[in-house]
Curated annotation (Swiss-Prot):
Keyword Ion transport: no
Membrane-spanning parts: 19-39
Major site of localization recorded for this protein: membrane
Extracellular side: 40-945
Notes on activation and inhibition: Substrate specificity is modulated by calcium which enhances the enzymatic activity for cleavage of acidic residues while reducing its activity with basic residues. Inhibited by aminopeptidase inhibitors amastatin and bestatin.
Superkingdom of source: Eukaryota
Binding site for substrate: E215, G349, A350, M351, E352, N353, R878
Binding site for Zn(2+): H385, H389, E408
Group of enzyme by EC: hydrolase
Name recorded for this polypeptide: Glutamyl aminopeptidase
Length: 945
């Protein structure tokens, strides 16, 4: 699975000056905002432009009514009270038939599950949620004899349906199986999980598509099943659908036949063994384009007929990366075909269903005339990510969700190798620093982080671990591991692992064993210290080559021994170091409590670079004199260090300063050379690193203008060099968008003037905006010169355009307006799926929170509408759980109190338990940070000539 893009590709965002002064009691804040939103809606609703064409209508159909065939029960007399399924009940095959009643927003189905029993029982239980059993289940012995059913009931606490037989069920042996048959029905609307329907426009007509999304625990919403990843089975799937539709599933079509004049039945080939979360089927009226892999496998991309051209790039990148992975893993793709399909409203970024990968449109469809280079890279990365899963995740699946990183960390790591193979000039092997390593090091330096391998025991806990630790930290430690044991032995170890556990389940220890076999190195001993405890170390260098380690935490007052770890927050660190152009690795044993000395041959003032290219998942702190030397070296000739090293210096220094391990004056000195910096990697990290300071001081009327003036000067030379013409290489276009966006953010008049001029020309219809400048022009043009007419025009363009990537940019532009009445109206539009798709609700809230005028409004809107959001998305929705992190920039005691009060009012956090911990910790740290650091930072900026 790939995350939806909750945040823009750039961490920094528009934050102008606040013009409102908060006054009055705290209680009044919520009331005022609530009233302003309501009054604005009632006064302004008539000015919202009508769609240029009738939008797809949201269904008002009700879910199927419970017929009480298997009524609810709180009976806890059996093992079904446990969260995990029992080991003695194991499915081996599903015969699944589903009928999609597209016009009625519902479906019916029948499933027969072949089950092995390793011990006698009278009770069978399996997962179900929301879907209803419509007929008493039927159970047959291996002989075919029917077993009388005493009763069935739903045990909703653990999302089970329990079937109790009237007779003993003996253990099975060999190929003998029990056959459990259940008829069921479900609702096709109401959410973006399970089997659901969404709509789109085609030539002015409303069209429908229905598809599944099952990871991690939503297959049980589509059909009754043993919904755990280690309950692998084969599947024979049939879909009955209106004759004008077609059907897809994991496997190729076996046959298609008319049931009657209106209905067609499509039957698919029996599958290989796979987990329930990978089962997929779709009912559609799309068209496909096709490529063939080098091994002869058909690779198809299904899209709306009028979007066919936008699927070409995805088809091409699929072919190139697919062939690369078949070679790299030395294992042919296991299924006869691989399809991809773009779903018009899709909750996550993409889902790796075996043989039928589903995508959000922004992550699959690319128009070279309308999409930005960043969009192209996003498509390539997500396609590669999902292709990795066809091996890591699908062929070999983690045994339980505590080892989710075996799926997601691996996909996040290998996606960069795959795209690097296909797009060799994109610097993808360095961009992993920007996308994964640096961001997750910030997350993992909080006390509220969690280990890579983490115990999960509820659906909410399972969905919550689909986070940066599983994805990005997983990728980061694999990058370090590959460097330590060498890429060749790492590749061999992956091949051993895939072959040994093909069509089966594995644990983290199994992967370590495979790599040890390939490398003859103590992989488990080293790597368990990185996966079984949270956090990471800072390596402190003294005397140029003596190093010690300790846990790195952003909160300098936190107890580094908490929560308790058997390893005591010490790590076995593969320390790469370079002297005189020679690079070596020394494994720093965690038991060396006094530190170690690197065997370097240093002469004169030679510099020993620890962690070159930030290859290891740790930070490095040098002595003050060494940091001064680095700053001087950057100013005199920054190219003596690689772009990755320059990024690493900056990221480490600002993180160390934030943790009070380094004076901010030293960190800020590293930015003095930036007038000479022309590379993408360092600038991206500078912008991200200083964004924290910018965010903390945006309301400081004395200090913020100093910050603006300084960074305007630092960015201007490269901004002038790049200009406003959309030309150059892929990397140059990414750099230009970042640099000009940062110049606008820092209030550069020339940059804002150019953005406004392009925006105004676009409003007048006299000129189009260059594709790679559109996002920043929509944002800063709207901020700088946007009014109600401009906002309405932008909304009209959002409703007219069919390209999802363009829609996303326009959503950000709408969120950048200064007019709070328009922002209030925008927030209320989130309740209308005819205007804002369900998939985009949390994206828009986040965009509004990046606007200084919308930050508090967005947070208060969430509080006022929490019951509505929970009702619409459920408390276990990971995106609802994470939306509270929009409060991370808050830095006052009042704001902290408001957050604590809100969380106390709604104590059931569901999938948001960990995000709540993280945002509270962050805001507390922000308050302390301001008290400690404002003076030294002010002195540094005030001392500038």
């Amino acid at each position: 699975m790939n995350f939806a893009e909750e945040e823009p590709s750039k961490k920094y965002c528009i934050k102008g000056k606040h013009v409102a002064i908060i006054c009055g009691v705290v209680v009044a804040v919520g009331l005022i905002v609530g009233l302003s939103v309501g009054l604005t809606r009632s006064c302004e609703q008539d000015t919202t432009p009508a769609p240029s064409q009738p939008p797809p209508e949201a269904s008002t159909a009700l879910p199927p009514q419970d017929q009480n065939v298997c009524p609810d029960s709180e009976d806890e007399s059996g093992e079904w009270k446990n969260f995990r399924l029992p080991d003695f009940i194991n499915p081996v095959h599903y015969d699944l038939e589903v009928k999609a009643l597209m016009e009625e927003d519902r479906y019916t189905g029948i499933v027969t599950i072949s089950v092995n029993l390793s011990k006698p029982t009278r009770d069978l239980w399996l997962h179900i949620r929301e879907t209803k059993i419509t007929k008493l289940p039927e159970l047959r012995r291996p002989s075919g004899e029917q077993v009388p059913i005493r009763r069935c009931f739903e045990y909703k606490k653990q999302e089970y349906v329990v079937i109790q037989a009237a007779e003993d069920l003996a253990a099975t042996s060999g190929d003998s199986v029990y056959r459990l048959t259940m008829e069921f029905k479900g609702w096709l609307n109401g959410s973006l999980v399970g089997f659901y329907k969404t709509t789109y426009m085609e030539d002015g007509q409303i069209r429908s598509i229905a598809a599944t999304d099952h990871e991690p625990t939503d297959a049980r919403k589509s059909f009754p099943c043993f919904d755990e990843p280690n309950k692998k089975s084969t599947y024979s799937i049939s879909i009955i659908h209106p004759k004008e539709y077609s059907a897809l599933s994991n496997m190729p079509e076996e046959k298609s036949e008319m049931v009657d004049d209106n209905w067609k039945k499509t039957t698919f080939v029996k599958s290989v063994p796979m987990s329930t979360y990978l089962v997929c089927f779709a009912v559609h009226r799309f068209t496909a384009i096709e490529r063939k892999s080098r091994s002869g496998k058909p690779l198809k991309v299904y899209v709306q007929p009028n979007q066919k051209e936008t699927a070409e790039y995805a088809a091409n990148i699929t072919q190139a990366v697919f062939d690369y992975f078949e070679d790299y893993f030395a294992m042919e793709y296991a299924l006869p075909k691989l399809d991809k399909i773009a779903i018009p409203d899709f909750g996550t970024g993409a889902m790796e269903n075996w043989g039928l990968v589903t995508y959000r449109e922004t992550n699959l469809l690319y128009d070279p005339l309308l999409s930005a280079s960043s969009n192209q890279q996003r498509v390539a990365s997500v396609v590669a990510h999902e292709l990795v899963h066809q091996w890591f995740g699908n062929t070999v699946t983690m045994d339980w969700w505590d080892d989710l990183w075996l799926n997601e960390g691996f996909a996040s790591f290998f996606e960069f190798l795959g795209v690097n193979h296909a797009e060799k000039d994109w610097q993808m092997l360095s961009q992993v620093l920007l996308e994964d390593v640096f961001p997750v090091q910030e997350d993992d330096s909080l006390m509220s982080s969690h280990p890579v391998v983490v115990t999960v025991s509820t659906p909410a806990e399972i969905t919550s671990v689909f986070d940066g630790i599983s994805y990005s930290k997983g990728a980061s430690i694999l990058r370090m591991l590959q460097d330590w044991i060498t890429p060749e032995k790492f590749q061999k170890g992956c091949q051993i692992y895939l072959k040994k556990f093909q069509f089966a389940n594995a644990k983290t220890s199994d992967f370590w064993d495979s790599l040890q076999e390939a490398s003859n190195l103590p992989v488990k001993e080293v790597m368990d210290t990185w996966t079984s405890q949270m956090g990471y170390p800072v390596v402190t260098v003294s005397g140029r080559q003596n190093i010690t380690q300790k846990r790195f935490l952003l909160d300098s007052k936190a107890d580094p021994s908490q929560p308790p770890s058997e390893l005591g927050y010490t790590w076995n660190i593969p320390v790469r170091w370079a002297d005189n152009d020679n690079s070596r690795i020394t494994v720093y044993n965690r038991l060396d409590k006094g530190g170690i000395t690197l065997n370097a041959n240093l002469s004169g003032d030679a510099f020993l670079k620890i962690n070159p290219d930030h290859i290891g998942f740790y930070r490095v702190n040098y002595e003050g004199g060494t940091w001064d030397w680095i700053a001087e070296a950057l100013s005199s000739n920054h190219t003596r260090f690689s772009a990755a090293d320059r990024s690493s210096f900056i990221d480490d220094a600002f993180a160390l300063a934030r943790a009070q391990l380094l004076n901010y004056k030293i960190a800020l000195n590293l930015t003095m050379y930036l007038k000479s910096e022309e590379d993408f990697l360092p600038w991206e990290r500078v912008i991200s690193s200083v964004s924290y300071i910018i965010s903390m001081f945006e309301d400081d009327r004395e200090l913020y203008p100093m910050i603006e003036t300084y960074f305007q000067g630092q960015v201007k030379p490269v901004a002038d060099l790049l200009g406003w013409q959309d030309t150059g290489s892929h990397i140059t276009k990414l750099l230009r968008a970042s640099i000009l966006g940062f110049a606008c953010k820092m209030g550069d008049r020339e940059a804002l003037g150019n953005a406004s001029q392009l925006f105004d020309s676009w409003l007048k219809g006299s000129a189009s905006i260059p594709v790679n400048l559109r996002l920043l022009v929509y944002r800063y043009g709207m901020q700088n010169s946007g009014n109600e007419a401009a906002w309405n025009y932008t909304l009209e363009q959002y409703q007219k355009t069919s390209l999802a990537q363009e829609k996303e940019k326009l959503l950000y532009g709408l969120a950048s307006v200064k007019d709070v009445k328009l922002l209030a109206r925008y927030l209320e539009m989130l309740k209308d799926p005819n205007i804002i798709k369900t998939q985009d609700v949390f994206t828009v809230i986040r965009y509004i929170s990046y606007n200084s005028y919308g930050k508090t409004m967005a947070w208060n809107w969430i509080q006022l509408n929490w019951d509505y959001l929970v009702s619409r998305f459920t408390i276990n929705d990971r995106y609802l759980g994470r939306i509270v992190t929009i409060a991370e920039p808050f830095n006052t005691e009042l704001q902290l109190w408001q957050m604590q009060s809100f969380f106390a009012k709604y104590p059931n956090a569901g999938a948001g338990a960990k995000p709540r911990e993280q945002v509270l910790e962050t805001v507390k740290n922000n308050i302390e940070w301001l008290n400690v650091n404002r003076q030294s930072i002010r002195e540094w900026f005030a001392s500038l000539p």
